[in-house]
Amino acid sequence: MNRPLSAEAEEELEWQVASRRRKAWAKCRSSWQASETEDLSTETTTQDEDEDDEEDLPGTKLPAPAGRGNVPNEKIAIWLKDCRTPLGASLDEQSSGTPKGVLVRNGGSFEDDLSLGAEANHLHEPDAQVENCNNILAKERRLQFHQKGRSMNSTGSGKSSGTVSSVSELLELYEEDPEEILYNLGFGRDEPDIASKIPSRFFNSSSFARGIDIKVFLSAQMQRMEVENPNYALTSRFRQIEVLTTVANAFSSLYSQVSGTPLQRIGSMSSVTSTKEVADSPPPLTRSNTANRLMKTLSKLNLCVDKTEKGEGGSSPATEKGRTLSISLSEDGGGGKSDPKLQKVVKKKESSSMLATVTEEVSGSSSTVTDSVDADRLSEEADSTISHQEESEESREAHSQEKDPLRKSAVTDPDLGHDGRVSSHCELESSSELKSAQASSSEKEPCAPLTIPSIRNIMTQQKDSFEMEEVQSTEGEAPHVPATCQLSLAKSKRDHLLRTASQHSDSSGFAEDSTDCVSLNHLLVNESLQAMGSSADSCDSETTVTSLGEDHVTPTAQDQPYFNESEEESLAPLQKGRAKVEIVAEKRKADNQDFPQCVTAENAGNNESTKGPCEPGHQITETGEHPPLAATGELPREESVESDVEKGSECEFAQYTTHHILRSLASFEAQGSGMSSEKKTGFPSSVDRVNTALQRAQMKVCSMSGQRVGRSLIKSKDLLKQRYLLAKAGYPLRRSQSLPTTLLSPVRVVSSVNVRLSPGKETRCSPPSFTYKYTPEEEQDLEKQGTEHDGQSLVKSTIFIPPPSVKKEEAPQSEGTRLEECHHGRLAPCPQFAPISQSTCSLHSVHSEWQDRPLCEHMRTLSAHSVPNISGAACSAFSPFGCPYSHRHAAHPYRACSVNPPSAIEMQLRRVLHDIRSSLQNLSQYPMTRGPDLAAAPYSTQNSSVLPLYENTFQELQVVRRSLNLFRTQMMDLELAMLRQQTVVYPHMTEEDRYEVDQLQGLRNSVRMELQDLEMQLEERLLGLDEQLRAVRVPSPFRPSALPGMCGSRSVDNLSCPSPLNVMEPVTELIREQSYLKSELGLGLGDMAYEIPPGESSESVFSQATSESSSVCSSPSHTNRRSRGLPGSKPRARLVARKKIFRASVALTPTAPSRTGSVQTPPDLESSEEAGGAEEASPVVGLASHVEEEPEDLSLMPAAEEMHRNVEQDELQQVIREIKESIVGEIRREIVSGLLAAVSSSKAPGPKQDSH
């Protein structure tokens, strides 16, 4: 539009246009109606009046839709309000706030509200014009707006009435023209060139994105068409077709052999195989020869026949392979062998036999020329061997296998295998010798026994083929053999066949042990292994398969990177493995029943589960050469395993390095069922296996190979030293993992933990050693041997890490593993006898009634030392601490430093200390009642009221305990942080600052020292109470009389009163328990035949975080389970009531990062170890694990207990003295180090290291 030069003209034109547009919009909305003409009695300029009249005169006005009532126009008002200020609003409008307020309150028509945008479509005024209008008319419009806006809330139809009839009027009166707003919002303007919306970078440079190049695509299509031309054979283009062709040819060849009618082979394999295939293909067999043919073919397929021997001489390898495949498939169908398994086996065998081609094709189609050659040889060999009697073939096999460098190198069976074959040539053994991939395949496929003998022959023939990878003995195959045969074979195999070295491919599923066929566990394990191993086998075979020219040496672990650590271990250089195997073979001869136990590195974790405990084939452990593989903590074990493996019972517990909490005992028991069956069959005793595991663990520290043969127990000191070294090496606290769930059921797993407790410092927990209890007979043997080799071993208290109920485990066992244990299920709780339950270490002196109650769960969470009966006499020691802020220990004058207001953290720490002291004081109030009361409570109804108190007190104490732990941790962390910061700044500090620093340091030291002092005093009290408790307990274990004090509100507190901080307490309890057990065992209780089998040390250190929660106490149910675990002596299991079961659950709270010099030296370990010779006795720095200690079942003999107590006292006193001395020395060191740390920066890193 042409703009008039004058402002007024400009405005006039603008408003005319605006009014016309609004009218047009109203009409299109069908909302224009006649309205009364109104005088614009406003103070607006005549121009505005004219404009208004023009709008009104047409007699049509936007009515306020009366029917709708006064619809509030707040939405539009808000929209206008939001838009107007920044968009060219005039100074006038900005200064006026009233219009805005009016606006918001005004109502308008619903149509206006909905159709504001329609008007925007007609706006084409340039911005500049609108802005000019706004500047000029702002005042006038505002006047109108004020006048009419006051009555706007009633949307009258006439302007004369002073009301605004429509939104358009309102907008017109508003100081800012809505057109301007809409323009600014982007309405009604010409769209800019769309190119302007595209960033220039897209035009400046071409895109690098790759699309479809039509030319390339077309050329590819043309090439594909050419390749797929039938003239080139489909196999050259599609691998699938190639495989299908091979299979079809195999079937056709099989059919031709069976039917005697030659068939045209599908697709000339010319592209892959030589033309002489046809010539080589054997003439169709007559029906009379069909059976022979099938046998030979199967043997070829299953046991890659030596490629050197070409029985068929020229049959194209593809045909041979196809034939073998077809035969195996047919047999599978008929013989009940699973076709897929056979195929897998055949593939593996072929790949192994045709070493030249390691590629998948070899295994899948086996159509490579080299394969064909090998196949020919194999077929010929198979034919020749098949013709011979199976047994003779087997014998040959044994000899040939011995000859075979592969087998020999494959440490697996050559030596052992030979013996095994000799003893039980039974088809299985010879086939087991075939350990080659075929063996694994045969294992996978439940081959008919018939296949196995032929396979043996073939294997013997396979001198040239490199099947080291599969060097697994046919033990794995045994499951395919009839159960009876399997049993006999298993025994012989156990004695002779050990797949010690060639375990590398065991993971491929060879883990299936024929020896274990007796036990379902093995079968299950085998199945799982097969599932796992199917892929593993293929990988293993391929990796192990090397050119035919290669030495027949099992590739080292390096050769087979794919293998799990366990596999790698088994792959240890064959030479080494061979030598070991030979040694093992000899040992095994001595221990015919023992089978090497497989140690699987954590890497093989998946295999671990699948391998199952009974997988003699996995003698990977034997390869001590790969300790690094087991570096996870298996190192000692694996090394020791070499000899142990041989000795290990056939059911090897796959020893897992995995750091999990022991699985529930139930899992062991489940395994035990299989184990018991094995025992029945004369399999090596589970005890042997346990011993083997234990020896393995200790191999590193003490080379007791000779003792191992005797299954001697390892000395606790040696173990402790070893563990200490391991811990020092930086092993983090780990969770112990239970043996595979499929372990022999008779097993009772008891774990002993060497705990090295440095007061106020990081505790170190040696990986707990686990003892597995099997049938009593076995235990007796172990006991005898153990006593001969190491008297202490018997004494070591075994820690039973049961899967306490899930509730309990919550914190300590939050880790899934423990929960798994729980899931495995717990045997029904068995009532504990008061004396047993009352043992100071066991809060569980709970009556069986309580066991099912939630309280019981809570009780379990109580620390093992939770029920120290602290005598009143000891109370005096704590009297000073009863006062929250009583003077620091007299020895520490640092209190004076507190002149400065303590920091918030220090205050918090003091509060925590106050809580601790109060709890201790509370305990001291009920010196003697606690122990007896607890024991009595379950038996007396009057004590029923104690339960709620007990729960409440327990919870409170737990809170205090956590706060204490938190306090210690925070304090240590705080100190470390402060020292680090101060050391940097200290040289630059002023004297005053340094003085403050020294004061704070002194304060912290005093706090720490006070805590240690409290622990020391608690220790003394506990010892005194323990004696008193025993005196009370022994005479009447069930004595129901409950002291009335027990009913007192706080009497129950005493149960958990012992300071959770007290690190020494658990140690002393362990020692006490050890000595007690020792005395009991020494007093002719050996006849009970319950010996503590050597624990298998699985590095399990419970993470400190987990440990923070209270330790889990074993409940009576554990005892019951334990007793049941003994397979051979179920009656004895029932006798639990007559046997004394000591349960100590030790809650070692995580200690805060220790300060400088926190790590205690091994000497302390030894001293603690000596006490009771218990492995637990050796504290390991940083132990925060919750270990549940469960000594062996012992008969309840009060008299004997008294005697033991006397014997025990001396040892306890000695140990206590040593501990005190070490603590005192440590405290001194800490004081000095603390002082130095504040001054010398060099010491700053020290504490950090100690904490780790």
Swiss-Prot record:
* Locations listed in the record: Cytoplasm
Region called Disordered, residue ranges: 28-70, 306-483, 552-575, 595-636, 1095-1131, 1147-1180
Q: Ribosomal protein: present as a keyword of the record?
A: no
Where on the chain is Phosphoserine found, per UniProt?
90, 109, 207, 268, 328, 465, 643, 667, 736, 738, 745, 758, 766, 866, 898, 1036, 1051, 1056, 1059, 1114, 1154
Query: Can you tell me which residues the record assigns to a coiled coil?
Result: 955-1031
- GO terms for MF: actin filament binding; signaling receptor binding
Q: Where is the composition biased (Low complexity)?
A: 357-372, 429-441, 1103-1117
* SMART domains attached to this UniProt entry: KRAP_IP3R_bind (SM01257)
- Where is the Glycyl lysine isopeptide (Lys-Gly) (interchain with G-Cter in SUMO2) crosslink found in the sequence? 807
Q: Does the keyword Cytoplasm apply?
A: yes
Task: Enumerate composition-biased segments (Polar residues).
Answer: 1151-1161
Residue ranges with Acidic residues bias: 36-57
Name this polypeptide is given: Protein ITPRID2
What gene is this protein a product of? Answer: Itprid2
